[in-house]
């Protein structure tokens, strides 16, 4: 069989190039709903994260603005360029797995006291560095010591404003293991963009990052964050 190896260098990121499906959706005639989310808005703007210029296009208002999830009325998107669209072109490589993700996986393992050949803090920082390098973004060392926190979402049309989803910083928290896990997964979530399914799976698995509730909740307000476990598996471990 074949083997694939993702090393601890951004030039070993696994990707492939073809007609990028996100570009196909975003550029489809009459479809305007592919925009930045409010949660990404809060984290990238609050952290003043320089990757936002790589991930998203400026809105017509000259800022990076997202929208709360769950709007029923599609008219909120129409006739207004005040929202940021994905900065993804037809030939933008589609990422499968990155060196940054590997570092964050190791950081989480180290936090659980597994032998990951590094401390949680060192691996967390290496994950951020790898993400910056992957996207050709500079000033990562300044970012790593930043005490900035996620921003309040100011709202957009019928998309209501909301307090900041979290109070974590980029600079490593030395006091709380819980906060450290939140930092690791939040930065992993940012670095995974635009892999929405993987990012959603991280939230379901860990509860992080802290995200905004959707505007119209059709599930009764209950979102399961647990991984389904079969009855047979449970009985085998009783």
Model region roles, listed by residue range:
Residues 1-8, 232-238:
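Conserved small/polar residues in nucleotide/adenosyl-binding loops
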Residues 180-235:
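Extracellular low-complexity, Gly/Ser/Thr-rich intrinsically disordered linkers
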